[in-house]
């Protein structure tokens, strides 16, 4: 596993960071979720992600929206990326606990940075008929999140 650094430099006095490495989720879906929660308060983002997991609220898909139907709310096409939301919620909880450890107040913090990078591809094969095999690759994602007390 390669060493991954944060893509922005943040002030360590009033920020907390968290990172998830090589998570087995879709890069496209996780990008859309991160774009939606960026700029939210940490408590709002946690509630939003829990609603997505419960399939009560859709995530608007702006870039990868082909085939996504119209959903209720201010969006054209949207989906319910449950597995990506679960992993991003884990990273958010980790960032909140890091803030609490540093003596910051997690309830008053905003997500100033939520980004993904594609991780390594885990190559695999699926056996097929007549002795053949088809490739079955698993994509991974690296998620980085930074919370700050000031916007």
Curated annotation (Swiss-Prot):
Gene3D superfamilies to which the protein is assigned, alphabetical: Ribosomal protein L22/L17 (3.90.470.10)
GO MF, one annotated term: structural constituent of ribosome
InterPro entries noted in UniProt: Ribosomal_uL22, Ribosomal_uL22_euk/arc, Ribosomal_uL22_sf
Biased composition (Polar residues): 1-18
Entry keyword set: Ribonucleoprotein, Ribosomal protein, RNA-binding, rRNA-binding
Single GO BP term: cytoplasmic translation
Signal peptide (UniProt feature, chain positions): none
Similarity field: Belongs to the universal ribosomal protein uL22 family.
Function as written in the Swiss-Prot or TrEMBL entry: This protein binds specifically to 23S rRNA. It makes multiple contacts with different domains of the 23S rRNA in the assembled 50S subunit and ribosome. The globular domain of the protein is located near the polypeptide exit tunnel on the outside of the subunit, while an extended beta-hairpin is found that lines the wall of the exit tunnel in the center of the 70S ribosome.
Name the record gives this protein: Large ribosomal subunit protein uL22
């Amino acid at each position: 596993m390669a060493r991954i650094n944060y893509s922005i430099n943040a002030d360590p006095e009033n920020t907390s960071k968290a990172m998830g490495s090589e998570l087995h989720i879709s890069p496209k879906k996780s990008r859309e979720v991160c774009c939606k929660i960026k700029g939210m308060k940490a408590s709002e983002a946690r509630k939003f992600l829990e609603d997505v997991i419960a399939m009560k609220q859709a995530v608007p898909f702006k870039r990868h929206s082909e085939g996504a139907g119209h959903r209720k709310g201010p969006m054209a096409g949207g989906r319910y990326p449950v597995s990506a939301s679960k992993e991003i919620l884990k990273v958010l909880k980790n960032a909140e606990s890091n803030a609490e450890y540093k003596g910051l107040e997690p309830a008053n913090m905003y997500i100033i940075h939520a980004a993904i990078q594609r991780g390594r591809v885990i190559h695999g094969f699926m056996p097929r008929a007549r002795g053949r095999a088809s490739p079955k690759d698993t994509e991974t994602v690296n998620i980085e999140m930074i919370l700050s007390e000031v916007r």
